[in-house]
């Protein structure tokens, strides 16, 4: 009987000990969550898309090319520029990839406070599916093109239409998600789409044809912007890390960074192997004439 009482007492003590331990674990977990919430709120968050113009940002983040005591960089990954826009509008990011036309639209129409950090090497290509019968811009009559409105894609679409003898009008369909646009093209659900690298190479490998490219334009539209005037010390730290990443990227072939490209852009080795040579730019402000052009392009 005494032995049973002893065992029951021991079990009760053990149970109380477990309860205290669980309460401590819960309290520690809550404290950790609170610390992370505060750290996240203070972090320098960057809106990115799964495209090659974001590769310097992916590299500086994954390779820790910055002093974490000076800046805590967090990536906000989006598969559409529209989601980046929403993040900028709601103050969820301190910097974001975009294009000049989009940035000027957001400043003018949405009253978002944006400042240009740098131009980028981003280019855009118009690709048509084999089943569309489109082999050149003149064949685009009565076709449907997937794009994002109020952006470089809309500008380029207007340029294609005005610069070529197209017998009948074609139509723009707003499809914002990069992956959905590509999937629709490959499934013959749309005649043509605007893409950027690496999706351009991915689409070409699947038999789609390039009809037009932004490299034909005397205009450099790719850009990275600051949102709502982040701290100057954070801007300087981010730019220093960005320049380090650019120097590293330019010292190797693009295929050297295959793991990084596959991780963030969801492509395979075949696509990476076929990517064209890309030279990245250190931080350089967009040209004033390019900004003025973007400002006056869309109504």
Residue map of PLM features:
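Residues within well-ordered alpha helices
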Residues: 65, 160, 202, 260, ...
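C-terminal motif of bacterial Sec signal peptides marking the signal peptidase cleavage site
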Residues: 15-17
């Amino acid at each position: 009987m005494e032995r049973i009482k002893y065992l029951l007492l021991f079990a009760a003590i053990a149970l109380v000990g477990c309860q205290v331990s669980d309460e401590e674990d819960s309290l520690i977990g809550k404290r950790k969550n609170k610390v992370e919430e505060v750290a996240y709120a203070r972090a320098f968050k960057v809106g990115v898309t799964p495209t090659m113009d974001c590769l310097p940002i992916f590299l500086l983040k994954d390779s820790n090319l910055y002093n974490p005591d000076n800046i805590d960089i967090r990536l906000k990954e989006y598969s559409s520029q529209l989601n980046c826009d929403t993040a900028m509008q709601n103050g969820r990011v301190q910097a974001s990839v975009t294009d000049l036309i989009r940035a000027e639209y957001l400043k003018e129409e949405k009253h978002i406070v944006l400042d240009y950090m740098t131009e980028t090497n981003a280019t855009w290509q118009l690709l048509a599916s084999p089943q569309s019968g489109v082999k050149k811009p003149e064949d685009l009559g009565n076709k449907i093109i997937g794009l994002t409105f109020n952006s470089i894609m809309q500008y380029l679409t207007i340029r294609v239409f005005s610069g070529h003898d197209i017998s009948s009008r074609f139509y723009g369909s707003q499809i914002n998600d990069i992956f959905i646009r590509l999937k629709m093209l490959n499934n013959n659900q749309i005649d043509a789409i605007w893409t950027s690298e690496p999706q351009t190479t991915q689409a070409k490998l699947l038999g789609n044809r390039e009809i037009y490219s932004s490299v034909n334009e005397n205009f450099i539209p790719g850009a990275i912007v600051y949102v709502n005037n982040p701290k100057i010390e954070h801007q300087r730290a981010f730019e220093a890390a960005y320049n380090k990443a650019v120097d590293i990227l330019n010292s190797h072939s693009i295929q050297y960074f295959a793991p990084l490209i596959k991780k963030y852009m969801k492509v395979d080795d075949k696509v990476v192997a076929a990517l064209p040579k890309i030279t990245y730019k250190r931080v350089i402000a967009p040209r004033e004439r390019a900004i003025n052009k973007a400002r006056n392009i869309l109504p």
